[in-house]
């Protein structure tokens, strides 16, 4: 990526969670992503930054945005990209994650992107392979690149995140996006509010440094950013809400509820959206929505992450240390 060598060396080998990052790490990735946005907006979008490098996308859960975003990011950086279809792989025959990891490791990839239904899967994979690992979502635990792309979207529209009021509304309980965003926003000095019915709030959520409310009017009051989350019914067992209609009435974002936020508040959604459940179409498609911008920033952030993890200066530093130890 153009002039990336002028930026500090990213200090981590993997991206497993926002919890592993310092504010400086986050800002460094966002700065790199800003450069990637410029590349993505050129007529010639492909660079040779990762030419000769191999990227494997290993998705155990269905994904449209994240998988295609990682694939496009890798190709724009010049990497050789392989998408592994779990549905037609040995996983369906009973192969464990560790066995799959060892098989892929023998192919000598440079970076593995994994999405898995179990929390901690990416961290386990990182212990078993010799390449960099990026967590593309592990159960309800973390989704670090989503939080980074959300932060980039906000920063480009609002400037520094410090002191901004961000309301995260919806299914907090099952959301890895909420967890990663809360950690990132707190790290950069934003005030975070979470808005949800009691049944969709994790116990002890207050310990994450957020303001908790069960009222949209209260949660959205003077907010700079309103981030809506979908009901993750595929992760629910039992009745968490009385009905979709009842949920939208109290917690769905419509024009009337949005009036409580600042007039220039950003409306965000990680996708996929359930229109008429957590957000009205008039808001999703309205002038305050930056949902499509989030998709664009997703490619840029994933380009930045992979470039940072595979920075050739890391190998140079390793060789220097080996030389000193000899």
UniProtKB/Swiss-Prot annotation:
Pathway: Pyrimidine metabolism; UMP biosynthesis via de novo pathway; (S)-dihydroorotate from bicarbonate: step 2/3
Pfam families: OTCace, OTCace_N
Binding site for L-aspartate: 93, 176, 230
EC number: 2.1.3.2
GO terms classed as biological process: 'de novo' pyrimidine nucleobase biosynthetic process; 'de novo' UMP biosynthetic process; amino acid metabolic process
UniProt: carbamoyl phosphate binding residues: 65-66, 115, 143, 146, 271-272
InterPro entries (alphabetical): Asp/Orn_carbamoyltranf_P-bd (IPR006132), Asp/Orn_carbamoylTrfase (IPR006130), Asp/Orn_carbamoylTrfase_sf (IPR036901), Asp_carbamoyltransf (IPR002082), Asp_carbamoyltransf_Asp/Orn-bd (IPR006131)
GO molecular function, one term: amino acid binding
Catalytic activity line of the entry: carbamoyl phosphate + L-aspartate = N-carbamoyl-L-aspartate + phosphate + H(+)
Enzyme class: transferase
GO terms under cellular component: cytosol
Keyword annotations of the record: Pyrimidine biosynthesis, Transferase
Physiological role: Catalyzes the condensation of carbamoyl phosphate and aspartate to form carbamoyl aspartate and inorganic phosphate, the committed step in the de novo pyrimidine nucleotide biosynthesis pathway.
Subunit text: Heterododecamer (2C3:3R2) of six catalytic PyrB chains organized as two trimers (C3), and six regulatory PyrI chains organized as three dimers (R2).
Protein family per UniProt: Belongs to the aspartate/ornithine carbamoyltransferase superfamily. ATCase family.
Name by which UniProt lists this protein: Aspartate carbamoyltransferase catalytic subunit
